[in-house]
Amino acid sequence: MINLTKNKINNTNLFYVIIITIFSFFINFYYSSLGSFPIDTFLHYDSSSRILNGELPVRDFWVVSGLTVDFIQAFFFKIFGVNWYAYVIHSSLFNCLISLIVYFFFLEIKLGKLKALILSLSFATLSYTISGTPFVDLHATFLLLIPTLL
């Protein structure tokens, strides 16, 4: 279990956390806007905006995947408005979260700060950027990985 009091957030760790946060957010934010896959990229966009308009999945419209990502995205649409940037902020923040958890996990197993940084940045590059937008398979994988690492 990751214990942040044991892994004191000193200046080096704080600097690495800032690097990981900025890198993991912006690498996903950048690559998510390079192109789209009509079948996958907009899978949760429409259903999330419909939830925001008061409709409920299954009762009012058909969904092809789980409901978790739709409701999380509806929350982001509520905060940032229904637009592409709100859609991408969701996946970019999720990339930050999982990358930081991976970093602290590597510190917990005493991998070393620099190695943990490099591996966490590598993880951030590969984790959510393959889709760029909220995607049910990636959310499911990472929501299972988070408690495993914690």
Predicted regions and their residues:
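Transmembrane-helix signature of polytopic, membrane-embedded enzymes
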Residues: 102-125, 141-142, 146
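Membrane-interface starts of transmembrane alpha-helices
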Residues: 12, 82-86, 90, 112-118
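Extracytoplasmic catalytic/substrate-binding loops of multi-pass membrane glycan-assembly enzymes
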Residues: 32-47, 57-75, 82-85
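Short acidic/glycine- and proline-prone juxtamembrane loop motifs at membrane-interface regions
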Residues: 132-140
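Transmembrane signal-anchor helices characteristic of membrane glycosylation enzymes that use polyprenol
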Residues: 10-39
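Loop-to-helix entry region of an early transmembrane alpha helix in multi-pass inner-membrane enzymes
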Residues: 67, 80-100
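Short, Lys/Arg-rich, polar N-terminal cytosolic tail immediately upstream
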Residues: 1-9
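Alpha-helical transmembrane segments of multi-pass integral membrane proteins
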Residues: 73, 87-94, 136, 148
